[in-house]
């Protein structure tokens, strides 16, 4: 009979954010509240306030309020329809040219900060992130280098029993940006499964996405086949933003 190994204590990756700025707007998402924060360095960040409260205490927040927040990063799923894609462009009139487009649905992800503590009032300008995790993939755009980091922190959801008595967990994912492929003037070379701990700041990168790419993601690219001016429709573009951790220092752990 094979002896059973004793359970192993769980070890969690680091995942923390400290940030301050002014509330730009607020909106409801079910029982939760989402906030757009205008940060001192010109960045904008999305915050998630679970159940519209902190530790069960209701809050009073308004546009323009200066706040300081501590929390952690997650990727929040949301759905976008073809109708919403065209509404962003002010081109709902095109729905008649592409039957079925309004019903197409694409599952997307948005990076946000889950708020654990919040102070209202002027504060020292702050935008600090510490995250640790396993590199899932890397890519490059010109001289810029990026990585997707899988973070197994104490806030991750469990999904059944894993090995040696530990629960199986679903990672949080965040994107890292290494400006010019460097950290502190040193070139960075990464590969999948590298274990990193980074210090950085939150930043948004703007990009455009075509209707053709949206439909390809959503499995509805065939809808354009019979549409008039399908080529021009395919190239209709909407503006997107993606949130990254801009890496300012790096620890690359060895096994």
Q: Where on the chain are the PLM-derived regions?
A:
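OB-fold and OB-like single-stranded nucleic-acid-recognition modules
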Residues: 1-255
């Amino acid at each position: 009979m094979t002896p059973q190994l004793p359970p192993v204590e769980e070890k969690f990756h680091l995942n923390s954010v400290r940030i301050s700025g002014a509330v730009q707007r607020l909106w409801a998402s079910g029982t939760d509240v989402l906030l757009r924060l205008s940060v001192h360095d010109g960045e904008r960040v999305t915050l998630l306030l679970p159940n519209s409260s902190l530790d069960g205490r209701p809050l009073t927040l308004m546009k323009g309020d200066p706040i300081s927040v501590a929390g952690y990063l997650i990727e929040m799923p949301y759905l976008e329809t073809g109708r919403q894609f065209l509404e962003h462009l002010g081109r709902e009139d095109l729905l008649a040219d592409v039957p079925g487009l309004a019903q197409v649905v694409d599952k997307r992800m948005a990076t946000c900060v889950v708020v654990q503590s919040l102070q209202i009032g002027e504060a020292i300008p702050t935008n600090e992130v510490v995250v640790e995790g396993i590199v899932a993939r890397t890519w490059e755009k010109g001289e810029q280098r990026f990585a997707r980091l899988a973070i197994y922190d104490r806030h991750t959801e469990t999904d059944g029993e894993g090995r040696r008595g530990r629960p199986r967990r679903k990672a949080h994912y965040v994107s890292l940006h290494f400006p010019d492929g460097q950290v502190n003037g040193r070139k960075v070379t990464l590969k999948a499964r590298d274990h990193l701990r980074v210090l950085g700041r939150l930043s948004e990168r703007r990009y455009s996405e075509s209707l053709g790419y949206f439909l390809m993601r959503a499995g509805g690219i065939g809808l354009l086949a019979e549409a008039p001016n399908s080529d021009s429709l395919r190239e209709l573009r909407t503006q997107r933003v993606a949130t990254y951790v801009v890496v300012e220092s790096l620890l690359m752990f060895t096994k």
